[in-house]
Amino acid sequence: MLSPANGEQIHLVNYVEDYLDSIESLPFDLQRNVSLMREIDAKYQEILKELDDYYEKFKRETDGTQKRRVLHCIQRALIRSQELGDEKIQIVSQMVELVENRSRQVDSHVELFEAHQDISDGTGGSGKAGQDKSKSEAITQADKPNNKRSRRQRNNENRENASNNHDHDDITSGTPKEKKAKTSKKKKRSKAKAEREASPADLPIDPNEPTYCLCNQVSYGEMIGCDNDECPIEWFHFSCVGLNHKPKGKWYCPKCRGESEKTMDKALEKSKKERAYNR
């Protein structure tokens, strides 16, 4: 059995690991969205150059028919620029949702950590109340330096040793119990991490929050975006599409790629070509 002090250290270690799991991938996700916004900005600059050329051509043109054609080109360029602006707004909204979701996860971990602390404090208080007063008065002066030295040694131990250290009362528990406690702790931590990645059920869900993926659920955990501009879903959970990490190059969702892993569905490909031709 672990002492209250070591129990608090274990809960602290678990909290730090949960915290790192929640935020360690956040910079990469945000960087991907920022890169998409830069690509949109580059396309927008190209459209501005086209508009300048069309405007100069419109001023020089004297034929009415040619002027109408140039004016039509200007209108299409303006529509494309508006579409790019809408895409940027959508990306920013996704970034805000991503940060809010990770913030809720961190808040949930904080609540769990505080709950463990409250339980530990209550258990420690009951144990102190039940101690015999005569035993506390019978502690000799020679025992006190040993207790202080033990505390200093525990503070100097690394995170793994901190979870296995025992105080003077726990030495009689034996090596098998220490191994059992360590194995049980690892199993509980792995189970909790798997549950967090599998479902966001333990987090408060906003009823107005948009849904994504094939499962039609809110954004949580690791997600990947489909590189098909015509994709109706756009974002997918890693677990729902069988991914463990982000693949290199372009990635298309099961609905868009059809039977092939590297090509999009023929209907969507045709729609994309028609849209490019109309532009």
Swiss-Prot record:
Any single biological process term in GO: protein import into nucleus
Cellular localisation: Nucleus
Record's keyword terms, sorted: Cell cycle, Isopeptide bond, Metal-binding, Nucleus, Tumor suppressor, Ubl conjugation, Zinc, Zinc-finger
Domain of life, per lineage: Eukaryota
Cited SMART domains: ING, PHD
Tissues in which the UniProt entry reports expression: In the adult, widely expressed with highest levels in thymus and testis.
Major localisation: nucleus
Task of the protein: Isoform 1 inhibits p53-dependent transcriptional activation and may function as an oncoprotein. Isoform 2 acts as a negative growth regulator by cooperating with p53 in transcriptional activation of p53-responsive genes and may act as a tumor suppressor.
Protein name: Inhibitor of growth protein 1
Organism of this sequence: Mus musculus
Species classification: Eukaryota, Metazoa, Chordata, Craniata, Vertebrata
